[in-house]
Amino acid sequence: MTTGTAVLEELRRLSAAEEIFDALEHPYRPEVVNVSRLHIMKRFGQYLAAIDFTPLGAADARAAARDALSRAYTDFVDSSPLEQKVFKVFAKPSRAFVPLTGLSIVED
C-alpha cells in the first residue's frame, strides 16, 4: 500500500463526520454539519473518487483529501441539501400526478 492510499485507509476507519474534519484539521460549524452531515460526506466521497491517490505521498494525499472535504463542506455552507441535489431522491424529477377528482367525463 502506498502512502497516498494509506491516508484513505486511515479516513475509512473513522466513523463520524466530525472525526474526519478533525483528522484532516478542517474547521467546521457544528450547525452546518448537523443539518447536512450525510450530504457533505456523500459529496466528499464523490470528490475523493475523482482523485488518484496512488502516486501521492502522505502529505500530498492528506492535502488533496482536505481540499475535497473543504469543497464538499463549502457546497453546503450557503445552500441547502435540496439545492445541491446530492442524493437521487432530490435529483430525480417528480412524476406528473393527476388525482381522480381532477378527472371528468366528457360526453359528445
UniProtKB/Swiss-Prot annotation:
**Species for this entry:** Cereibacter sphaeroides (strain ATCC 17025 / ATH 2.4.3)
Q: Which gene encodes it?
A: nifW
- What does the annotation say about its assembly with partners? Homotrimer; associates with NifD.
This one is known as: Nitrogenase-stabilizing/protective protein NifW
Q: Where are the transmembrane segments?
A: none
Keyword Aminoacyl-tRNA synthetase belongs to the record: no
Q: Does the keyword Iron apply?
A: no
**Which InterPro entries has this protein been placed in?**
NifW
A biological-process GO annotation: nitrogen fixation
